[in-house]
């Protein structure tokens, strides 16, 4: 092999890069373990304190658990800006560790839809003409079953029902007068609406992004999904779904506030500091807790700085100055700083400061008009990037509301100033706002006005002069990005397009931990089985394949981390499947080398020719599988995309390691004169010299397959499927009980409860389904009750109906808060999903499109690659045959087998994976047929095909067995969540292997033979 040195160098560098990427995950876990040890010390110290003796026995466990969690969180917050690994802070390390999906980590996945229908109405100033209303209604109706965005659908509907009325008459409102002129064409008006929609979606995205930052979760994710108006939010580890729903769907509240001067408030802060010291000292239990906090701080300081501090002096200062120990006053060099900022605090201390300032005894010290608010971004005055400014807001109105809200802002944009060319923000207001703004700026010349969104301060510029006319320029040392962010904030105050939750998934941390354990166990077992199988079958060469497999796993995980890919439970299934498929390339190569050795070639020549002859089959097979992975990634979402990502990356790393790593090892051994064994006495002549007439038996297999396909179609037509909630819409809950329960009893109780609620509220078409999920103490409950209503009140109502129906089935009393909370609660709702009907239709439509596109792409690739469309037809027929029988199996055995066989996104992922895997078999066989036709051009087609099928039997069986072994490991040890996926893949492997030999190839032969006979008849 040429360039061995370069390949070896690249492999070493790639391995080093992967180890470097994975090292961040290791360091992160080390720091988290230290946090746990630190938290344990805090728990032990509290157990030995006088305060612990006063805690009721029933509350002691909860109290200690709370201290453990809070201490661990406090430790990690404290080191977030500390360098813990080669110059990287803990925060940076955490950002670079491997991302776990919600199904492994627990948390919440939410898809929000920006309601463009409301935006279009608002831009028309809620036009009430019948034609406009009809066009809106028609566009809304069509949006359910269309991939077009709402504005395109509205444009089409207006052309149908508008009666020739120009859109300029509808949208030429006072506020839109600068953008829509009387002479504007319909196309120009639609273009304006699109720009406003894009702005509204962008503003909603920014509002949501900043709200998410306030949850304090690690590695949150938010992404805008094209121009659909949908925003996907992932919050790993969040444990308060109700709070998330309310905060994400809340209306953006933009306000303008006057401010106090720091010098006006500082004396009151000093008084508050003294009063807090007295309050905390008066309460003995609070004192003990504060002492413990001081000890915790000392422990942490020792661990981080490794130097001794005067613990007693520090403790005394904290007791005497509790507020100033966490809030640094805006006092520098003994002088009170100018401006509205009254102090600085670490992010982890802001909640404590808020709590203290709200205490009645403390609140009474400050002026009645005083309202403290935090900046949304860290202060630039304090290094570290984790310190925020506390600003003194002045409430001048009688009702305590802001003197001016964002509803008066008509536009905000970034422009460049006349002096210096720095970015600045230009803001325009309507007539009402202009008058109020003139009064407000006139009263605060030389002072600062705070721009507040959702209770957080985005900017508080100084007023230079009274501003009249409603147009203002906000200047500062803005970067372009900062100026754009501020402009978006100002525009968000007039957001006419609310965002509502249309899809939601909640996974409790306990279920996530169980999924991790199950996934890791299945991965390790599958990995060991594959390693063992390769050694048993191929001896020394099998050991070399195992080395390549180890490198493959390293490269695969390293690549996943470097790309920031999210590892999900289906993703682990993809990893395990990759292990099985990774050895396929080695099997193809080894079988080729064995053929060359049997032909009498020397070891070195056999290896060279074996690799050369195996390349085309390996590349073609892996490309077809990768193509289905790409289709799956494009049309899938969430965990399905995670599965596709690991599959695609795994295919690439598998090809590289199986071809290059093994070849380097073989060449080195050959160069040193060492022997390499490719078999043992049991496997040496395995399936060699077989003379099976496969094509002669095709009529029998046609009958068998035809019967199975007819049975599948009948089951699909008459029995149908058990659809997952992502295909039907509705809400699904996995509920864990503290005892074993009967599915029939749960079904009866839940159905009765939801039917009663439906009758009481005049809700139609309510369906309820209950299935055992895992053990006898877990049930999966799906309901379509109020599926079309998406408010948080309905979510709470559904959970309450479910709670009332199920609370009698718990041995221990459980409150509704305990039942619905995923906060480390072992029982009650441990996971939930909500899918709106529009999203369900989109998912179902995309699934069907994905399957057909995959088949078309594979047909085209094989037809082009083998230069004959009949070969593509044979391959696609084999795939369709496999898919139909697997789908029929899920239809027929749903409700019969003791595990769920739902047809959902994961099932579609399995079907597409089966298509990608099964075509691999076809490609290897077709490649051998092509080779035999080249070697024996005068032989009959039937003879060449039978010879090719017999010669590839060993490869086909070995690949199928290794892949089956890993899939069985997933099915047995992978847990309930992915068992259905594993079953589908096992069926697909078995049926796909059969179909590639007995269906795809015979179909190709029959069609090719018919064409040849037809040509022969014409030539006569």
Question: Predicted segment positions?
Answer:
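Interfacial segments of transmembrane alpha-helices in multi-pass membrane proteins
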Residues: 2-4, 425-426, 430-445, 449-450, ...
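Cytosolic juxtamembrane regions of multi-pass inner-membrane proteins
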Residues: 580-624, 667-675, 891, 897-959, ...
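Hydrophobic alpha-helical transmembrane segments of membrane transport and translocation systems
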Residues: 2, 8, 12, 551, ...
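Non-transmembrane, solvent-exposed regions of membrane trafficking/translocation machinery
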Residues: 19, 23, 27-31, 44-462, ...
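Small-residue-enriched core segments of transmembrane alpha-helices in multipass membrane transport
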Residues: 12-15, 543-564, 575-582, 643-658, ...
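Juxtamembrane "pre-transmembrane" interface segments
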Residues: 234, 469-473, 481-525, 529, ...
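Transmembrane helices with small-residue packing motifs
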Residues: 15-49, 90-102, 113-123, 688-739
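Pore- and gate-forming transmembrane helices of large, multi-pass membrane proteins
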Residues: 208, 510-530, 549-550, 581, ...
